[in-house]
């Protein structure tokens, strides 16, 4: 019975986990990367305490994160376009 409860809880957390491109809150731009696929830098950024993700990799030259909490913003930010100055 306990194992069924644990499995159900894990599935619910997995289904409700957020994913998306990491975004720089000050510029509104995605975190860039060059090595597509498995990428240590993206994985490290996604797993950082202020992001809270479970896994990150490089997709379309930007860091894509999985398992993010709802509080972590992802690209695009509302009312903020990417401004590279």
Curated annotation (Swiss-Prot):
Disulfide bonds join 29-82, 33-58, 42-63, 46-65. GO terms for biological process: defense response. The keyword Endoplasmic reticulum does not apply. It is found in: Secreted. Pfam families: Toxin_3 (PF00537). One of its GO terms (cellular component) is extracellular region. Has the structural arrangement of an alpha-helix connected to antiparallel beta-sheets by disulfide bonds (CS-alpha/beta). This is Toxin Cll5c*. Residues 1-17 form the signal peptide. The lineage of its organism: Eukaryota, Metazoa, Ecdysozoa, Arthropoda, Chelicerata. Residues 18-83 form the LCN-type CS-alpha/beta domain. Beta toxins bind voltage-independently at site-4 of sodium channels (Nav) and shift the voltage of activation toward more negative potentials thereby affecting sodium channel activation and promoting spontaneous and repetitive firing. InterPro entries: LCN-type_CS_alpha_beta_dom (IPR044062), Scorpion_toxin-like (IPR003614), Scorpion_toxin-like_sf (IPR036574), Scorpion_toxinL (IPR018218), Scorpion_toxinL/defensin (IPR002061).
């Amino acid at each position: 019975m306990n194992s069924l409860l644990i499995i159900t809880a894990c599935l619910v957390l997995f289904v409700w986990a957020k994913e998306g491109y990491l975004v720089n809150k000050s510029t509104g731009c995605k975190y860039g990367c060059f090595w597509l696929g498995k990428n240590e830098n993206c994985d490290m950024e996604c797993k950082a305490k202020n992001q809270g993700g479970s896994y990150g990799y490089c997709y379309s030259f930007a860091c894509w994160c999985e398992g993010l909490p709802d509080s972590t913003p992802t690209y695009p930010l509302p009312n903020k376009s990417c401004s590279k100055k």
